[in-house]
Amino acid sequence: IFDNGDSSMSLGYLQTDKSSLIEKNALALSFINKKLDTSFLIGHSNEKNGFLNNSFEGALSVEKNNPTNFIAFKKNKKTKMGELMFVSSLGTTDVKNNNNSLIRNIDDVFTSSFAINYSKPNILFNNSNLNFSILQPQRVESGSMTYDIPGLNDKDGSLNYTTYTSDLDPSGRQVDLSIKYSIANKTGIKYIIENKLTNDHGHVSRDNLDYQIAASMMFDF
């Protein structure tokens, strides 16, 4: 839309392939201030036959169009000690109900996510990078679903239903702590080792932490 050197504003559109489990299209307006190294993103996305990357079909189907409005913020800060980055997003989703579904209503769906990342180049060796990050994947902070559960038939053959309402916010909050070290050589090969500690994987409350260690190699050509 405009770019005056220090600041810019752009409008983007994204559409997933129709072969995807959930068809999604999104429209986003972004503003970037290069001096402050700060950016804002405001957008609107629409998912077909589902919401928040979850598919709802058959007896638990929802309508074709389920819009989400979201806002995101990103801030970078470069210092002599390295670079610090913070990213956060908030969203609200309006789920459209299907009259032929056992789901009656899905209301007040509010989501959040955030990430904090610190990186320091040239630790121990040239062309190396040490990275610390804390991440919370997208989580439903609030929302409720009202639905019918079929019971026994009456003598006349009519089916009885019992209506329930359940909160959609999960029992836990997934937070990932990651430490990653990478080094590249002159031939274009990059060696990476990453340690990750996860609390409440999948936003399901757990007594224990999950630990992962991974080593990989990348070659640029």
What do the PLM-derived regions correspond to, one by one?
Residues 1, 7-12, 19, 25-30, ...:
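Outer membrane beta-barrel transmembrane domains
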Residues 208-221:
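Outer-membrane beta-barrel "beta-signal"
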